[in-house]
């Protein structure tokens, strides 16, 4: 056995499972960071082991998907008496399960899963169940994990955060940080062909507030209701990524063609792909989203509903990194490169009335609102930075469904009233802020009944069905009010469902602070 494999064998699944339980059992951020850092020191300097531990404690598999649904986890064999499973052995088992394909794949996958659970203790089984079921919520969010990596490596947290921002892969950054090489994180730079986490926006109550928060002047842009895309070009090679950093190049040939027409050799751009009607008004979001399906006949889809691409930011252009440049400089580079037909409408103003007219015109054109950007702000990749504020005609929030109630009357037999949670950035948990059954079409009721049956935890026999907190839903609200009914002390006013956001994960849901900001 090589020294590296011997190192891998020294950390057991039990060690990770108990650390996960410890982290989930404390509300203290400092205690969470210290506990994770302690485990990471034990795993260092083995890069593979560090990456596995960081992935698991972040609630993810290195393999991402291995074909194991919740139904396969409902029954499990008796637990082992003593812990013997190593982290590397379990990771290898996940890889083996994920590689199963062809005739009899389901039975073979089930047998491998059963063997894995049979070798696990009760503590380990509980951890595996939550990890594979997507329910591992012990509060180890990216910020906490980055702090833990920094503490374990003895380096500034800002260095880890920036490397993760540029590398788009915290496990890889953690492995480098704990390798013992002082300059290991220097390799994580902005690089064409490697996606970075997109910048996200906070919410403003109106254009006047947005101008005030940006210091008296703001750049307003039309907010398109399409699909976020990050475009990379290196010579004749174009790659297109979604907001979750999935490669969708093959599904969006129009974006590739439009990018190749630009007079540039090296480019990283942020933009929106959107389906338009013949009069250039936007189609419903679902029409755009249908172009991102995995089992898509691309040629037929392009013929039936072509997409247009609009670029609203540039991060790199022909050897020049613009990530840290102010918004005005990035937009100047954009205007010099991208033709007007592929830019979003824009207005720089300090006048709330002018901004209000711009918002009204944008809404009249069929778009969902405006973005207000600070002229001097950098591009804060991977962060919901204060440099971008979204303004919509009604307040909207992206929340997570925590539970759902069976309907009555015309909705009997349908899962109807959804319980809504906002993310607590301090703990990683979700705080319930209200319920709603409004805004749901018959088709939506059918869809969510199937979806939440799949996500159900503990069966669907009761009136209230608890679900794994994975489904993000966009709701419109008239505001919030104080309430002792919910743990956050606030309740949504007149919440109604706008759409389900399959393009967003629960970590991208709005925070309880965003809800409080509407009070």
UniProtKB/Swiss-Prot annotation:
Organism: Mycolicibacterium paratuberculosis (strain ATCC BAA-968 / K-10) (Mycobacterium paratuberculosis)
GO terms of molecular function: ATP binding; DNA binding; DNA ligase (ATP) activity; metal ion binding
Active site per database record: 223 (n6-amp-lysine intermediate)
Residues where ATP binds: 221, 228, 243, 272, 312, 384, 390
InterPro entries: ATP-dep_DNA_ligase (IPR050191), DNA_ligae_ATP-dep_bac/arc (IPR022865), DNA_ligase_ATP-dep (IPR000977), DNA_ligase_ATP-dep_C (IPR012309), DNA_ligase_ATP-dep_cent (IPR012310), DNA_ligase_ATP-dep_CS (IPR016059), DNA_ligase_ATP-dep_N (IPR012308), DNA_ligase_N_sf (IPR036599)
GO process annotations (BP): cell division; DNA biosynthetic process; DNA recombination; DNA repair; DNA replication
Family membership: Belongs to the ATP-dependent DNA ligase family.
Cell division found in the keyword field: yes
Cited PROSITE patterns: DNA_LIGASE_A1 (PS00697), DNA_LIGASE_A2 (PS00333), DNA_LIGASE_A3 (PS50160)
Protein name in the entry: Probable DNA ligase
Catalysed conversion reaction: ATP + (deoxyribonucleotide)n-3'-hydroxyl + 5'-phospho-(deoxyribonucleotide)m = (deoxyribonucleotide)n+m + AMP + diphosphate
Cofactor dependency: Mg(2+)
């Amino acid at each position: 056995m090589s020294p590296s494999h011997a190192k891998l064998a020294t950390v057991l699944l039990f060690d990770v499972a108990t650390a996960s339980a410890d982290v989930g059992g404390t509300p203290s951020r400092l205690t969470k960071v210290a506990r994770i850092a302690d485990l990471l020191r034990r795993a260092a300097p083995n890069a593979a082991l560090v990456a596995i531990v960081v992935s698991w404690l972040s609630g993810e598999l290195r393999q991402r998907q291995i074909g194991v649904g919740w139904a396969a986890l409902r029954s499990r064999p008796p637990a082992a008496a003593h812990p013997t499973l190593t982290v590397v052995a379990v990771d290898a088992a996940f890889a083996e399960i994920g590689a199963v394909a062809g005739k009899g794949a389901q039975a073979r996958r089930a047998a491998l899963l059963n063997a894995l659970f049979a070798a696990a203790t009760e503590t380990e089984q509980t951890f595996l169940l939550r990890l594979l079921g997507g329910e591992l919520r012990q509060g180890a969010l990216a910020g906490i994990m980055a702090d833990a990596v920094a503490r374990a490596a003895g380096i500034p947290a800002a260095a880890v955060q920036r490397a993760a921002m540029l590398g788009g892969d915290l496990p890889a950054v953690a492995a480098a940080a704990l390798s013992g090489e002082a300059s290991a994180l220097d390799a994580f730079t902005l690089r064409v062909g490697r996606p970075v986490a997109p910048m996200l926006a906070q919410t403003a109550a109106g254009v006047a507030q947005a101008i005030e928060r940006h210091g008296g002047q703001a750049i307003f842009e039309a907010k398109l209701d399409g699909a976020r895309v990050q475009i990379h070009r290196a010579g004749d090679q174009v790659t297109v990524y979604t907001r979750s950093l999935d490669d969708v190049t093959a599904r969006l040939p129009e974006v590739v063609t439009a990018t190749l027409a630009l007079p540039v050799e090296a480019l990283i751009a942020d933009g929106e792909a959107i389906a338009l009607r013949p009069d250039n008004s936007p189609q419903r979001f679902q029409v755009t989203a249908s172009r991102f399906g995995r089992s898509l006949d691309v040629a037929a889809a392009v013929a039936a509903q072509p997409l247009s691409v609009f670029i609203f930011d540039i991060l790199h252009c022909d050897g020049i990194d613009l990530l840290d440049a102010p918004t005005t400089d990035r937009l100047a580079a954009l205007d010099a490169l991208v033709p007007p037909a592929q830019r979003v409408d824009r207005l720089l103003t300090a006048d709330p009335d002018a901004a209000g007219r711009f918002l009204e015109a944008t809404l009249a054109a069929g778009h969902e609102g405006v973005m207000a950007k600070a002229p001097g702000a950098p591009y804060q990749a991977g962060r919901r930075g204060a440099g971008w504020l979204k303004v919509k005609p009604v307040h909207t929030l992206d929340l997570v469904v925590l539970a759902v109630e069976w309907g009555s009357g015309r909705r009997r037999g349908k899962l109807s009233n959804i319980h809504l949670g906002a993310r607590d950035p301090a703990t990683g948990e979700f705080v319930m802020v209200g319920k709603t059954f409004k805004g749901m079409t018959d088709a939506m009721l059918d869809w969510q009944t199937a979806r939440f049956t799949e996500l159900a935890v503990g069966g669907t026999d009761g009136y209230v069905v608890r679900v794994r907190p994975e489904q993000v839903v966009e709701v419109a609200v008239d505001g919030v009010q104080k309430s002792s009914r919910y743990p956050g002390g606030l309740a949504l006013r007149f919440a109604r469902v706008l759409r389900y956001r399959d393009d967003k994960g629960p970590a991208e849901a709005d925070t309880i602070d965003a809800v409080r900001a509407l009070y």
